[in-house]
Amino acid sequence: MLITWQDLSPETLENLIESFVLREGTDYGEHERTLEQKVADVKRQLQCGEAVLVWSELHETVNIMPRSQFRE
């Protein structure tokens, strides 16, 4: 189930994104990026619709994924 990021409080959204970024440990290439930069990147992706927040009823968790990978 999709969760609209605008429905979350700013603090909750920030915490979800930080948790996602820390969990993913994504490689950003030659230049290391700060946590704040990574969070800003994910937030921008949510705001422009490239990424979505997804609630898993099975696992009772929230995940962030590219919109193109989301299937209901």
UniProtKB/Swiss-Prot annotation:
Entry similarity comment: Belongs to the UPF0270 family.
Gene behind this protein: yheU
NCBIfam families, per the entry: PRK04966.1 (NF003438)
Native organism: Shigella dysenteriae serotype 1 (strain Sd197)
InterPro entries: UPF0270 (IPR010648), YehU-like_sf (IPR036685)
Name of the featured protein: UPF0270 protein YheU
